């Protein structure tokens, strides 16, 4: 078996190297090759992690939260394996381990931080048996792949019961996620924001409006956004649990700040949703037994990358790239963009490949009317479904420029724009757009 593990590791490393050389995303291919050679390669490698394995799940915020947790643990002097690129299905998780292994199949890691696609947890969790599951939120996403949220919840509930020793670190402000943790029988800790911070849009789409315990409509003392907030059931008493890690005195603007456990956290990020990402990572490192004394220093150096509010500079134009793949995430993206009061151009690129979900009807649940602001100087629509995106904007009387070629759209805005460009893309548009931006940034 040792020979098979070594062969799988070497073959995967070779495949990853070749793919990188020819400019391809070789991560998942490396994992696929490793499993083909050694079907139990993930069990063999993950069992060598010395202290604990974290699995990060949830609709939005997985990649940022997981990478931030990894950076926080490394700041505490720990050696960590992490699927940084966000390849979160089985092949991507396997690749994270085989590419971190030495040629002889040995792993040198105190922790593993693994982002896991919710539907893929059935293939991942039985193999790695996480010690902690960090659950960020549950929103409607890719209806043609996941179906209704209840299907995703059933999968996660099944995994919680199959790994009974796994502790859940859960967003207590999300009634759906909190119910799962509270009903699972697993031990859990919660994080959240106990007091209102910003006014939530009255017409915002909200999931999980009914109590999972008794079916009664939930009442809210206030909303943060979407269904996140202070909820309770007037019939059975189900309510937001007591928050173990509570972000207080939250400030949102050009940077974010809040207090938690007496620490003042400041981060140079935009977007209220990032308070949750930061708080989740903090809860993770604290639950692992660290006091988080290096957390603030880590934040000052942390670069989200991977298209999560990633910054580029192209011929004097500041470009911000961000992923927006469902109504809740897109609304928060728009909110973050509109916090910038300076003139701006926006490019929206929408694809409908299998990994995106071919059903793009969710675009009609996004509050695009908020982009009808004098600071928005132009909106360009691009990607495979650019015509659909243009129609969506037309229905809220927002004019747009049609340019199916993403690279040309970016070049045009860099040449003729106001010097401040936001590029909002869904999943399969992300990696190609990021490569375009990196290429353009490197041009003289």
Which sequence ranges carry the predicted segments?
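Gly/charged, well-structured mid-domain segments that form the phosphate/adenylate-handling core
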Residues: 238, 250-253, 284-320, 324
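Active-site beta-alpha connecting loops in nucleotide-dependent enzymes
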Residues: 323-402, 440-443
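Glycine/aspartate-rich loop-and-adjacent alpha/beta segment that forms the canonical ThDP
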Residues: 423-444
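Short glycine/threonine-rich catalytic loop with a Thr-x-Gly-x-Asp
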Residues: 203-209, 269-280, 306-307
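A conserved, hydrophobic alpha-helical segment in the catalytic core
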Residues: 127-137, 228-242, 269-300
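Phosphate-binding loop of NTP-binding sites
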Residues: 3-192, 200-202, 206, 210
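Cys/His-rich short segments
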Residues: 194-257, 268
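Residue-level signal for inorganic ion chemistry
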Residues: 115, 136, 169, 277, ...
């Amino acid at each position: 078996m040792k020979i098979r593990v070594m062969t799988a590791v070497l073959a995967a490393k070779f495949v990853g190297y070749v793919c990188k050389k020819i400019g391809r995303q070789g991560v998942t291919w490396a994992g696929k090759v490793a499993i083909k050679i050694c079907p139990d390669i993930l069990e063999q490698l993950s069992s060598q992690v010395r202290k604990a394995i974290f699995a990060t799940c949830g609709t939005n915020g997985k990649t940022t939260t997981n990478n931030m947790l990894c950076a926080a643990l490394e700041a505490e002097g720990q050696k960590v394996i992490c699927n940084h690129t966000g390849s979160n299905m089985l092949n991507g998780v396997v690749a994270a381990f085989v590419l971190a292994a030495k040629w002889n199949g040995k792993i040198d890691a105190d922790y593993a931080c693994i982002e896991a696609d919710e539907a893929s947890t059935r293939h991942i969790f039985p193999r790695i048996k996480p010690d902690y599951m960090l659950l960020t939120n549950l929103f409607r996403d890719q209806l043609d792949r996941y179906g209704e949220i209840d299907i995703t919840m059933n999968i996660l509930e099944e995994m919680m019961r199959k790994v009974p020793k796994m502790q859940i670190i859960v967003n207590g402000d999300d009634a759906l996620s909190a119910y799962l943790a509270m009903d699972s029988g697993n031990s859990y800790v919660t994080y959240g924001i106990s007091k209102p911070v910003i006014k939530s849009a009255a017409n915002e789409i909200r999931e999980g409006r009914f109590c999972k315990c008794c079916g009664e409509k939930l009442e809210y003392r206030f909303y943060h956004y979407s269904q996140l907030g202070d909820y309770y059931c007037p019939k059975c008493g189900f309510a937001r649990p007591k928050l173990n890690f509570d972000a207080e005195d939250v400030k949102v603007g050009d940077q974010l700040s809040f207090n938690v456990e007496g620490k003042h956290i400041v981060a140079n990020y935009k977007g209220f949703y990032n308070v949750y990402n930061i708080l989740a990572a903090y809860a993770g490192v604290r639950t692992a037994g660290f006091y988080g004394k290096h957390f603030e220093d880590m934040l000052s150096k942390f670069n989200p990358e991977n298209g999560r509010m990633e910054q580029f500079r192209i011929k004097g134009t500041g470009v911000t790239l961000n992923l927006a793949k469902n109504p809740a995430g897109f609304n928060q993206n728009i909110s973050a963009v509109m916090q910038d009061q300076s003139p701006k151009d926006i490019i929206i690129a929408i694809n409908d490949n299998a990994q995106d979900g071919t059903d793009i009807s969710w675009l009609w649940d996004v509050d695009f009317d908020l982009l009808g602001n004098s600071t928005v100087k132009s909106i360009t629509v691009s990607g495979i479904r650019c015509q659909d995106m243009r129609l969506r904007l037309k229905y809220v009387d927002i004019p747009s420029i049609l340019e199916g070629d993403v690279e040309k759209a970016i070049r045009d805005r860099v040449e003729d724009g106001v010097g401040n460009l936001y590029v909002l893309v869904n999943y399969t548009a992300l990696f190609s757009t990021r490569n375009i931006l990196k290429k353009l940034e490197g041009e003289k």
